């Protein structure tokens, strides 16, 4: 995944133009060695290049969960983090968020984790994915547009990591790939504080996937029932239905409100 705060000099339009008096933020640098010209790779190329999933860079941790248990019967949560040092992804599969992955000042600064939870609502399975766009410190607010762009670009890779890392589950229950993916973007800025439906998982994990604006987020039953799972009082991600005004702080426990996520 691209670093979400590694390109602070980019403008929010993503395709900046420069006047004759201005210099580009990331000028091309050339080195001459042995008579050859070697042009360095600028950060923009990585930022706007294709998002590619590499299975060899994924580390999977199963923490207190039955690999073969259907998520409609046992809570199943994904916690995905990225190391800028090793370029590796770490995916924890457990019943609750793996907060140990999210500790430390660097993770608090970057906030590039993705957490997700399987939900059964009115008898239908769906995957609810959460991304932190802004809030927490001023840098995240300044670059909220850029962070939203990067999260959208990298989410297909994230979803592929979920499917690959939890391979036994999908082999046993292939119908889960038909489940809708709901993406919750958490931000102090209203423009980026929203919920999007990315369609079925098998489509959402493709780079060309788009949002399905005609679909509405399903609502869980307000009382205990057998068609919704996990129950509201047991949900490992207790966020409100509406992302507006909701706090998303996975390091200290996600959300401050309980709702029908």
From Swiss-Prot:
Disulphides: none
- In the UniProt record, does the keyword Ubl conjugation occur? no
Induction (free text): Up-regulated during dark-induced senescence.
Q: Which InterPro entries match?
A: Staygreen
For this entry, the transit peptide stretch runs: 1-54
- Source species, domain of life: Eukaryota
Function summary: Probably involved in the disassembling mechanism of the intact light-harvesting complex of photosystem II (LHCII) in the thylakoid membranes. Required for the chlorophyll breakdown pathway. Acts independent and upstream of pheophorbide a oxygenase (PAO).
What does the miscellaneous comment read? Corresponds to one of the seven genes studied by Gregor Mendel in 1866. The green cotyledon (i) line JI2775 used in the original work has a non-functional SGR protein (AC A7VLV2) due to the presence of a two amino acids insertion.
Protein name in UniProt: Protein STAY-GREEN, chloroplastic
């Amino acid at each position: 995944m691209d670093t979400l705060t590694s390109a602070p000099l980019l403008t929010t339009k993503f395709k900046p133009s420069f006047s004759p008096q201005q210099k580009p933020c990331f000028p091309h640098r050339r080195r001459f060695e042995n008579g050859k010209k070697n042009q360095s790779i600028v950060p923009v190329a990585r930022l706007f290049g294709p998002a590619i999933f590499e299975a060899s860079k994924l580390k999977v941790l199963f923490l207190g969960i039955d690999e073969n248990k259907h998520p409609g019967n046992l809570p199943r949560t994904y916690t995905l983090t990225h190391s800028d040092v090793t370029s590796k992804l770490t995916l924890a599969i457990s019943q609750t968020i793996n907060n140990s992955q999210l500790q430390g000042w660097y993770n608090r600064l970057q906030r590039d984790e993705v957490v997700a939870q399987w939900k059964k609502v009115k008898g239908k399975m769906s995957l609810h994915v959460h991304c932190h766009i802004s809030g927490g410190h001023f840098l995240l607010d300044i670059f909220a547009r850029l962070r939203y762009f990067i999260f959208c670009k990298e989410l297909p890779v994230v979803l592929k990591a979920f499917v690959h890392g939890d391979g036994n589950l999908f082999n046993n229950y292939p119908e889960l790939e038909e489940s809708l993916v709901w993406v919750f973007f958490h931000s102090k800025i209203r423009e980026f504080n929203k919920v999007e439906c990315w369609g079925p998982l098998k489509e959402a994990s493709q780079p060309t996937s788009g949002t399905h604006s005609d679909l509405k987020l399903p609502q869980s039953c307000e009382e205990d029932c057998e068609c919704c799972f996990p129950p509201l009082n047991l949900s490992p991600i207790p966020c409100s239905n509406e992302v507006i005004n909701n706090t998303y702080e996975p390091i200290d426990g996600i959300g401050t409100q309980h709702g029908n996520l």
